[in-house]
């Protein structure tokens, strides 16, 4: 596994760990019914959470090459690896189309 994939995996774990807390703080920050000092307190708590605990920093990567672009989510591999595996035949149910 590449270093980038390991880093992305750690980000995914952190994001799931802090997901509920982050959503709660965001809801309190955006609630206009609360007093401004209470919203500021929750905004401060939100800023103190780890950066990598945000789902915006998670990126889908190919599990074999670590490529971040053009990754098929169902297979978790890039289009280049997918084409090679599909032509060789180890992907079940995938075959080259012809008409």
UniProtKB/Swiss-Prot annotation:
Sequence intervals crossing the membrane: none
Taxonomy of the source species: Eukaryota, Viridiplantae, Streptophyta, Embryophyta, Tracheophyta
Keywords (A to Z) from UniProt: Mitochondrion, Ribonucleoprotein, Ribosomal protein
Any one GO biological process: translation
Localization of this protein: Mitochondrion
Primary gene name: RPS14
Cross-referenced Pfam families: Ribosomal_S14
GO function terms (MF aspect): structural constituent of ribosome
GO cellular component terms, semicolon-separated: mitochondrion; small ribosomal subunit
Name listed for the protein in its UniProt record: Small ribosomal subunit protein uS14m
Organism superkingdom: Eukaryota
Principal subcellular localization: mitochondrion
Organism from which the protein derives: Oenothera berteroana
Protein family: Belongs to the universal ribosomal protein uS14 family.
